[in-house]
Amino acid sequence: MQPTLFIDRDGTLIDEPKTDFQIDSLEKLKLEPKVIPALLRLKAKYRFVIVSNQDGLGTDAFPQTDFDKPHNVMMALFESQGITFDEVLICPHKPEENCLCRKPKIKLLDHYIRKNLFDIDRSFVIGDRETDVQLAENLGIRAIQYDPQKMNWDLIAEKLLGETVTNCGKRPPRFAEVIRQTKETDIKVQVWLDEAGVNEIKTGVGFFDHMLDQIATHGGFRMNVQCKGDLWIDEHHTVEDTALALGQALKQAVGDKRGIARFGFVLPMDECKAECALDLSGRPWIKFNACFKRDKVGDFSTELTEHFFQSLAFSMLATLHLNVTGNNDHHKIESLFKAFGRTLRQAIRIEGNEMPSSKGVL
């Protein structure tokens, strides 16, 4: 079975007009940035299937001919660049019709399921909406939610191809798995330090999932995090215990630290200025400097940002300095997680075979 990418059309392959959400003329047809180079990189490994909801297609409000003209031009454009789609599957119904084929329902893909036409372990849904994520869950596969700023086509290709490596094949792959079970949480963390890829992260706290993904994405490694916590109380135990398990997994995956860079420092400048300095020293300590105006960002308590990094540093046995300034709490927290990921990327990179300490041990 070949790995398959089930790709949304409007808002993912091509721009979706925010006025009427219909591409019914050539004037509205616009490709998403970098989509063609990304698909050209991916086509050797994956086959492509378009899965799209087109509300009211074939009605007076959205005649079939109005749809066909820009759609056919789009398909011809992709084909002229060497990109073909095995199928184009379209639901023409409106939400109120309650059909069985509208995403996230899976009727459109029934033949793929019945005939085992896709590799469940290596296939993905790519789309810009939550319904695309839900479609992936219903199919039993993973999703990548497209966003032109945060998860663009360049990043999608990098994740799916796992092109970022830190080991270069010189040593056995650095992998660790940690299972942590308490009365409050049940957590499983897996990290692959020498390969990038799609991270599967589900803690039940959406903003926290996104932040953990930033660590792996900017750290240049792959990780899976599954957590079932006592969220009916609050997210404190989930965040704290995930940090402890992740820190333990990173520590185990790094191993005896022979040959690693050990140190990392990064200072990203955007709307927020985030500084991070890291030493995989074996001596846990943290200096954290950040002020937040809001109590929560989404479903995540801002006060848990410091607690997460403190728990992570002590579990990793690392020395960590973090500082951020800015106006938007969402961006400040995100910049800290990104900065930590970039710094960790430097520190875990293998540069030789020597122990990076005059003591001969870390």
Swiss-Prot record:
Catalytic positions are D8 (nucleophile), D10 (proton donor)
Q: Which reaction does it catalyse?
A: D-erythro-1-(imidazol-4-yl)glycerol 3-phosphate = 3-(imidazol-4-yl)-2-oxopropyl phosphate + H2O; L-histidinol phosphate + H2O = L-histidinol + phosphate
Q: What is the lineage of its organism?
A: Bacteria, Pseudomonadati, Pseudomonadota, Gammaproteobacteria, Pasteurellales
User: Region entry Histidinol-phosphatase: which residue ranges?
Assistant: 1-173
Q: What is its EC number?
A: 3.1.3.15, 4.2.1.19
Which PANTHER family does the annotation name?
A: IMIDAZOLEGLYCEROL-PHOSPHATE DEHYDRATASE (PTHR23133:SF2), IMIDAZOLEGLYCEROL-PHOSPHATE DEHYDRATASE HIS7 (PTHR23133)
Tell me the superkingdom of the source.
Bacteria
Q: State the species of origin.
A: Haemophilus influenzae (strain ATCC 51907 / DSM 11121 / KW20 / Rd)
Where does the chain bind Mg(2+)?
D8, D10, D128
Protein name, please?
Histidine biosynthesis bifunctional protein HisB
Q: Which gene encodes it?
A: hisB
Q: Where in or outside the cell is it found?
A: Cytoplasm
Renumbered to this chain, region (Imidazoleglycerol-phosphate dehydratase) spans 174-362
* HAMAP family reported for this sequence: Bifunc_HisB, HisB
GO annotation, cellular component aspect: cytoplasm
Q: Which GO terms describe its biological process?
A: L-histidine biosynthetic process
Matches recorded under InterPro entries = HAD-like_sf (IPR036412), HAD-SF_hydro_IIIA (IPR006549), HAD_sf (IPR023214), His_synth_bifunc_HisB (IPR020566), HisB_N (IPR005954), Histidinol-phos (IPR006543), IGPD_sf (IPR038494), ImidazoleglycerolP_deHydtase (IPR000807)
Q: Which controlled-vocabulary keywords does the entry list?
A: Amino-acid biosynthesis, Cytoplasm, Histidine biosynthesis, Hydrolase, Lyase, Magnesium, Metal-binding, Multifunctional enzyme, Zinc
Which Pfam family, an example, fits this chain? IGPD
User: Can you tell me which residues bind Zn(2+)?
Assistant: C91, H93, C99, C101
Question: Which pathway does the database say it acts in?
Answer: Amino-acid biosynthesis; L-histidine biosynthesis; L-histidine from 5-phospho-alpha-D-ribose 1-diphosphate: step 6/9; Amino-acid biosynthesis; L-histidine biosynthesis; L-histidine from 5-phospho-alpha-D-ribose 1-diphosphate: step 8/9
**Which family is annotated?**
In the N-terminal section; belongs to the histidinol-phosphatase family.
The GO molecular function terms of this record are: histidinol-phosphatase activity; imidazoleglycerol-phosphate dehydratase activity; metal ion binding
Q: Which cofactor does it need?
A: Mg(2+); Zn(2+)
